[in-house]
Structure formats: C-alpha cells, structure tokens
C-alpha cells in the first residue's frame, strides 16, 4: 500500500509554513516533505513533527542564491567548500529531525560551460555527502529535473541520474524518482519503475502537464501506485504538486489512502 507525504512547500500554502504540519495531519497524511528547512530552527520543526505525529520523509540541501539563478551548489566548480558546508548543515537537520534521507541539489550549468566538468565536481561532492551520512545510516538522493522546470540543470534524464549513482559507487546513494519530470523527459514510467526498482529510494508525483493533483492529466497514477506495490517499493511517495485551488478541496484522489 503506498505511503504518501505531503509536500509543505507546495501544498497547504493557504496557511504559513509552520502551520502546514497540522493541516497535513488533519488531512490524513502520516509524513511530510519540503524543499528547505533552513529558515527555521530544528527545534521549531521538531516541535511540529512531534505535536502532529508526522515523519519527515525528505528535504533538500540549500539552493544557493536563487535570485542569481542558482539551484544547488554541489556541481559548481570552485564552490566545493560551500557545497560541503551545505551538506554538513543538512546532516545536522537530518539528525535532529530523524529524517532518513536528503536530496543533494546539483546546480545549473551556465551556457557555454563544460557540463562534464560540472558533473565531475558533482560526483566528488556526492561521495563526500554519502561518506558523511553513511555512519548515521542515512541516504543521499539525486534527482533529474526536466528542462521546462529548471533549464540547464546538470541532468534531466533518469538515465543520467542512474549513471551518476553507478559512478559514485556508494551503497547509500539512490535516485529520487519524480514521475512528473521522468514522464516529461524519458517517458515509459512502467519500465523505469519495474526495471530500476531498488535504485530509487523516494518517489514524487504530480499531474502532467500542469503539475496539479495526480488525478489530473496524462499519467495514470492508480496504475503506478499498484506498480510500486508490485515491485515492493517501501518508501514514501511525496506529493510535490501545485493544487488547482484550495489544497483540501483537491484531495479526493487521496481518499482511498487516508
């Protein structure tokens, strides 16, 4: 049976972030995820998780300077010290909040730059992250982002992400399989889910093409949910979508699992 985590960066935005934990619990979720926790102390977030009996399924390393177009530092040559500091900070939060995994953001490759150089830096930094997290039994995730959402991100295909995981060669590094991005770039989700089971440790969902609720658009999510059960996937499925209207009003798709 699939287990769903509400994405608090995109859902329940009708209320301030710190109030979204209670909203997610009231809606029937057992877990949450979000992009970045760093504007809040670990104690503030821990209090919300404990009060609402929620598991934290996932968060990301810091993005860098979003206003300057950055979306992660771990692939950027010459920024290794900052990337390591972001990874170390993420580990502090993961330990304090009992989160089993963190998505390490790669970054954007500027036009005209050598993508292979950026990829080599990312490989080294993912190994650093994996080695920092491994003694604590925690996982590192990498995620492919489709060009329409994040142009010039280091990698857009699930197969590029898989190749990175293979080259990193650490037992605690996995794919973060976002079916919205995967369908846009690669398609053939059945093949990805079946043939690469065990390579992904977190899943995210959204309707295509508008990234709304998973009952909207071209992806047959009831089929995919059965498929995840079939292959024995035990991880969380993060609901990283933009509600069409009020979050609660769009949760009809979730009724069977509340």
From Swiss-Prot:
Domain of life of the native organism: Bacteria
Residues at the catalytic site: 143, 240
Family: Belongs to the hyi family. OtnI subfamily.
UniProt function note: Catalyzes the isomerization of 2-oxo-tetronate to 3-oxo-tetronate.
Binding site for Mg(2+): 143, 178, 204, 240
One BP term from GO: glyoxylate metabolic process
Protein name in the entry: 2-oxo-tetronate isomerase
Coiled-coil spans in chain: none
InterPro entries: HPT_OtnI_isomerases, HyI-like, Sugar_Epim/Isomerase, Xyl_isomerase-like_sf, Xyl_isomerase-like_TIM-brl
The enzyme's E.C. designation: 5.3.1.35
GO MF annotations, alphabetized: hydroxypyruvate isomerase activity; metal ion binding
Keyword annotations from UniProtKB, A to Z: Carbohydrate metabolism, Isomerase, Magnesium, Metal-binding
Catalytic activity line of the entry: 2-dehydro-L-erythronate = 3-dehydro-L-erythronate; 2-dehydro-D-erythronate = 3-dehydro-D-erythronate
Organism name: Escherichia coli (strain K12)
SUPFAM superfamilies: Xylose isomerase-like
């Amino acid at each position: 049976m699939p287990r769903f985590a509400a994405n608090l960066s995109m859902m329940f935005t009708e209320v301030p972030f710190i109030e979204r934990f209670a909203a997610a619990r009231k809606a029937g979720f057992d877990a949450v995820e979000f992009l970045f926790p760093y504007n809040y102390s670990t104690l503030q977030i821990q209090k919300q998780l404990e009060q609402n009996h929620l598991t934290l399924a996932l968060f990301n390393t810091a993005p860098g300077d979003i206003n300057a177009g950055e979306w992660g530092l771990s692939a950027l040559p010459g920024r290794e010290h900052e990337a390591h500091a972001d990874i170390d900070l993420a580990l502090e939060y993961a330990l304090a909040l009992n989160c089993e995994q963190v998505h390490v953001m790669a970054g954007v490759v500027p036009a005209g730059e050598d993508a292979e150089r950026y990829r080599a830096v990312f490989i080294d930094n993912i190994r650093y992250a994996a080695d920092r997290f491994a003694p604590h039994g925690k996982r590192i995730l990498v995620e492919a982002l489709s060009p329409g959402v994040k142009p010039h991100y280091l990698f857009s295909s699930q197969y590029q992400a898989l190749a990175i995981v293979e080259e990193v060669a650490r037992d605690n590094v996995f794919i973060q399989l976002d079916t919205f991005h995967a369908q846009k770039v690669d398609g053939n989700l059945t093949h990805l889910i079946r043939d690469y089971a065990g390579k992904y440790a977190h899943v995210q969902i959204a309707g295509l093409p508008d990234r709304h609720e998973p009952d909207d658009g071209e992806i047959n999510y009831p089929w995919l949910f059965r498929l995840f059960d079939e292959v024995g996937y035990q991880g969380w499925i993060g609901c990283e979508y933009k509600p069409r209207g009020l979050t609660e009003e769009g949760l009809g798709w979730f009724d069977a699992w509340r």
